[in-house]
Amino acid sequence: MMRIPNRSIQAANIFFSSGAILLLIAGLIMENWVELIPKVRKDKVTHSPWLGCCPPFWPEESLEAIRRMMMMSLNISIYLNLIIGLQFTYMISQNKCVHLLIGFLSFFTGCLLFYAIIVYHHKLNKGQYVYFVNYKTKWIVFTIYLTIALFLTCGIFSFIQCTNRCACMKFCVPHTESSSKAMTQNTIQVISLPPRSEMPRSIVHMHSDMPGKEGSISKPHLQSRRVTWAL
């Protein structure tokens, strides 16, 4: 099973979340997201979803809700980047709950931004030919889609990191431990002993110390036995 190193995933998450924050700040600073051409006068008016207020010729009240969603996504992304940085520096634990929290916040921020930009485009299409003649989007609008992609990628990497940790806890065994276990299993063999044979008969040799009559008298007392086993 292929396992991506956790440090590489955390470094990629820091890079993606930091890039998303920079893109959001750039979108906040630049106000020319779209150019509105009103009906009465042909002067172009720039507008941005970060403003919240609408031009006098476009009485749209729901733009404030879009601005709040954009600001909420920026705040969540800052906290998300902080959590990922603390995790990368081992200041918080590397458990499964932290990975799930980072993945959830990343997906939530990306979905919130996507919903806000979809609502903004819907309001532009709704106001077209009613309050203004036409509108033209600028290049800065496409940075919000790149920001959404960065947040979704960060969430996917967090879930991959969580999956790696779960798989490592359940199935993965360190190389040294697995090799030692394999060596132990290979070296341990059951050696069966042969059945015990019957005891050999003993050969008893009788020796007498003194020949003749005296030897026969003291034979019971001075008799010695030498036992040899026939192998």
Curated annotation (Swiss-Prot):
The keyword Membrane applies. GO terms for molecular function: protein phosphatase 1 binding; protein phosphatase inhibitor activity. The keyword Cytoplasm does not apply. Keywords: Cytoplasmic vesicle, Membrane, Transmembrane, Transmembrane helix. It is a multi-pass membrane protein. GO terms for cellular component: inner acrosomal membrane; outer acrosomal membrane. The chain crosses the membrane at residues 14-34, 72-92, 100-120, 140-160. Its main location: membrane. Residues 35-71, 121-139 are extracellular. Expressed in testis, specifically in spermatocytes and round spermatids. It comes from the Eukaryota. A motif (RVxF) lies at residues 225-229. Signal peptide: none annotated. Residues 1-13, 93-99, 161-231 are cytoplasmic. It is found in: Cytoplasmic vesicle, Secretory vesicle, Acrosome membrane. Interacts (via RVxF motif) with PPP1CC. Probably inhibits protein phosphatase 1 (PP1) in sperm via binding to catalytic subunit PPP1CC. This is Transmembrane protein 225. The lineage of its organism: Eukaryota, Metazoa, Chordata, Craniata, Vertebrata.
